[in-house]
Amino acid sequence: MHKIWHDRGWDDYLSWQGSGDCRTVRRINSLLQSIERNGYDCIGNPEPLRGNLSGWWSVRINDKDRIVFRLADGRLEIMSCKGHYD
């Protein structure tokens, strides 16, 4: 599956890598791998989003951070991986 990072998602990911928080980076990588393998049946308590984010899903990184993503045409699009649907 091909990953497409939106600008914010990539900036979030680089921010996590630069933070020195290896545990969170490993968790993000594990979640992305699970999404690639299992789609919306992945780990991380996947939830469909509503409103202006309809069509997007989220999975929990930790108590306050989520990966916001969608699957389309064999692609994994990552909108963000920090914060909570901002």
Located regions from the model:
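Basic, Lys/Arg-enriched alpha-helical interface segments
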Residues: M1-D65, L71-D86
